Amino acid sequence: LNKFTIREHVRWSDIDRAGIIYYGQFLRFFEIAETELFRSVGLPYSEVFDRLNVWLPRVQIHFDFHKPLVLDDLVEVSVHVSRFGRTSLTLRFEVHKEGEPDLVADGHVVLVCVDRSKFKPIPLPAELVERLKPYLAE
């Protein structure tokens, strides 16, 4: 399984009054990993939507919280494609504190490819699938 991994610190804006990461901030980590995955395969978000003439709205977001993180923890966020559908793809994420084997959080996001003018589902562009295929869990 080929995963794409980023490193990110838990920042002041990520923590809540209890001094641990606010659960919603895991979505920030997921979004950074997703964006950097796309950039790494030549599909930077600053260009991909215009080039392919599509949008990729998220229609499902799920995550499980396993262990707390605190300010300045360095985390590793891994992402891979768990599924290509006809009009959608599912990205799976795992969050670990750097150097520790225990899972801190994991989850998935489903993106649907839609026509930019009608906002109706359309097949995933072949270029998108081909470029992300190395990160598909088989």
Sequence positions of predicted segments:
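Hot-dog-fold acyl-thioester-processing enzymes
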Residues: 1-58, 116-138
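HotDog/MaoC-like acyl-thioester-processing domains
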Residues: 2-6, 65, 69-74, 82-138
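Residue-level signal for functionally critical sites in structured catalytic/ligand-binding pockets
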Residues: 11-16, 23-27, 31-34, 61, ...
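Short glycine/proline-centered loop/turn elements that form peptide/ligand docking sites
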Residues: 43-45, 57-61, 65-66, 80-87
